[in-house]
Amino acid sequence: MTESHDLGPIGDRVLFEDEQIRVWEMVLEPGERSPMHHHTHDYIVVVVEGDHVTVEPLEAGSKSAPVVPGHSVFLRKGGTEVAVNSGAVRYRDVQIELLDS
């Protein structure tokens, strides 16, 4: 990660937090981009709404994929990226950070 990038939060708002987990919500309208952000903890993403999302890592390239509401995925800490709603409908997810990771 380079220091020349201003980093934002991994989501729009914190829904819950205790000493073990922090739960975020992220909402992106079609074409909207999240701020560049860095994942400092392992986390689980649960898709709530949406049909397609693109992730643009700081390092280079992008990964685009269809998403299905209700689907969840575990991801390791360390990524620095921008999320883009590349779909036709609103994208919303819940991210659960594992604070002891």
PLM features per residue range, with description:
Residues 1-10, 100-101:
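Basic/polar N-terminal segments that are highly enriched at the extreme N-terminus
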Residues 8-35, 42-45, 93-96:
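A short glycine-rich, His/Asp/Glu-containing loop-to-beta-strand
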Residues 24, 33-35, 51-56, 72:
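Short beta-strand segments in beta-sandwich/barrel cores
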Residues 34-36, 54-55, 80-87:
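Short beta-strand His + acidic residue motifs that chelate non-heme Fe in jelly-roll/DSBH
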Residues 40-59:
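Glycine- and acidic-residue-biased ligand/ion/polar-headgroup-sensing regions
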Residues 59-78:
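Short acidic-glycine-tyrosine-enriched beta hairpin
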Residues 77-101:
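Ligand-binding loop in jelly-roll beta-barrel domains
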